[in-house]
Curated annotation (Swiss-Prot):
Entry protein name: 3-dehydroquinate dehydratase
Protein family (similarity comment): Belongs to the type-II 3-dehydroquinase family.
Lineage: Bacteria, Bacillati, Bacillota, Bacilli, Bacillales
Residues annotated to bind substrate: N74, H80, D87, I101, S102, R111
Reactions it catalyzes: 3-dehydroquinate = 3-dehydroshikimate + H2O
Native organism: Bacillus cereus (strain B4264)
Amino acid sequence: MKKLLLVNGPNLNRLGVREVNVYGKGTLATLEVDMKQEAETMGVELECFQSNHEGAIIDIIHEAEDIYKGIILNPGAFTHYSYAIRDAIASISIPVIEVHISNIHQRESFRHESVTAAVCAGQIVGFGFYGYKLALFALMEKLREA
């Protein structure tokens, strides 16, 4: 069975509590359960990881190449300034789909730019938790094309 990785970055452990007007009331635990179930219906295994620490995210991206077929990544605020995470993504050969719960292009100006998107296979923004499912569908299609 193919294995995929879902990586959530800083503050996403606070989903359901933090800025519910932006991110909704759903929790990270609920999101992870829903995503694992959706992946299972597609015949793949999804493992989930969340960290508030840039180095931990870089480490798991590096390790992912030998374990997983692809990554769904919400880098959180690291999206806008982490060239280290960008370089980690660029250093691996498996596809990465960037996802954001909110539409980063409609928010504060500092959130409009993603330094990580250019090295990802694609970016999905603004569809709430459903965006993660869209990312899963897109990643599966990318893997079929390979």
